[in-house]
Amino acid sequence: KALNESIPVYKKLNASAMIVLIGENAEYNENNVLKCLNAAKPIVERENVTLIIEPLNNIDRVGYSMPYAKPTFELLRKVNSPNIKMLYDIYHQNMMGDFSIDDIRNNIDIIGHFHVADAPGRHEPGTGKVDYVKIIDEIEKLSYNGYIGLEYRATKPDSETLGFLNL
């Protein structure tokens, strides 16, 4: 129901993707999520809508039911829809100890969006342990043409936080 109600808004805004979260309780197990995504599949394909599933770490978001990238990739491979992809949030995967450049390489076809923030702290790149120069370089080599969202809490002016992008 929520998906059908959201699609007209999505289209009116001419949005390129609809980011969705899975949920924060035990009933959002893999079988239920798979069932829901398979139910959404014909709708999003017919309406040419892209759903992007975002795994969030369950350290900052206690109780979030889908914190890891690997099982999310496996789930999306089972759904097998060009209209259902993953938001690979580099911060969240680093917080879970699950970040892998190989995961990005092997699944770039089902990544619909990236989020960037350093870990720990969720501040701009260069304030934590994540090597964003290497990561962005690798994403470029993979010919990724989607969005990379900067989702961090800046500790200095924006003009000083974007050096990792080599703009």
Predicted feature descriptions by range:
Residues P8, N14, T50, M66-Y88, ...:
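Histidine-acidic metal/acid-base catalytic patches
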Residues K1-K85, M95:
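Active-site acidic/histidine proton-transfer and metal-coordination neighborhood
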